[in-house]
Amino acid sequence: MMMRWAEISVDAEPQAGDAVSEALRRAGCDGVYMRDTLQPPQVTGYLPADDRLEARLDGLQVALQTLPSFGIVGAGTALTLRTVEEADWANAWKAYYKPMRVGRHLVVTPPWETPTLYTNDIPIIVDPGMAFGTGSHPTTQLCLAALEDYMEPALRVADIGTGSGILAIAASKLGAGEVVATDNDPLAVKIASENAAVNTVPLQAQEAFPVGSYDLVVANILADVIISMAEDLAALVKPDGVLIASGIIDTRETDVRFAVESEGFAPLETRHSGEWVALVFRRSTV
């Protein structure tokens, strides 16, 4: 007998998509994905329609209601539900994930697709089912393109807030000599390690904040987190090294820029995608 599933959808503006996805995942949802072509955009996931469903939905609503206290706006709290058969959902959500080209040669693809690759293309395989970062979010794409431009052979790289590990995997495939990926969520560390194995790249994934100095550091996290850890990020980057900072909504660009530049960084460039921003800095040699 096939299992029945509850399809749960929550309205989420782009800036809240990752947080809502994480809330669904923590509630136990499988197959979490964002439908950003809808108006308003929605995040959808699937829970078993069993005797634990009501308690899980209650917990999910509580989690969604607390998001504004963390500075996350644009997340709905109302849940839209419908019941689906296992055969329907198991493949339906996968239709939203196709190979995507980012930058000049990076191709992000789910494991069930076989993308067309051209000379010098670099495939990055990421399973979107865990909702830890699939490459579809503008900030991830900004960081991937920046990595492609600033990576040089054998650089030592740190990825702060790695999520799925997509940026760390890209750095490794672009020629980094050593990559350390950190996340304070142990499940993210596990998923990043699994994704690295699928991509057959070495990756040191850990919960602990890295120590030592790095040629390039990428931090695709919230603006407030970048601001709060600006001093720690500065300690990681070697003199003349590069910091790529994103996860920044355009209204917070000035705040992030001030915090980072106050720690001895000079701006190199600013990249935009809609309302999202990636900032690239070089650490002073003085």
Q: Which residues does each predicted region cover?
A:
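Conserved helix-to-beta-strand junction in the class I
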Residues: 146, 150, 235-239, 263
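Hydrophobic beta-strand segment of the Class I
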Residues: 216-218
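Conserved beta-strand elements of the Class I
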Residues: 124-125, 158
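A short glycine-rich, Lys/Arg-flanked "PGG" loop and its adjoining helix->strand segment in the class I
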Residues: 227-242
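N-terminal auxiliary segments of SAM/dcSAM-dependent transferases
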Residues: 3-10, 14-118
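Active-site capping/gating segments
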Residues: 249-286
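Conserved short alpha-helix immediately C-terminal to the canonical SAM/SAH-binding motif I
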Residues: 187-191, 225, 252
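Conserved SAM/SAH cofactor-binding pocket of Class I
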Residues: 130-213
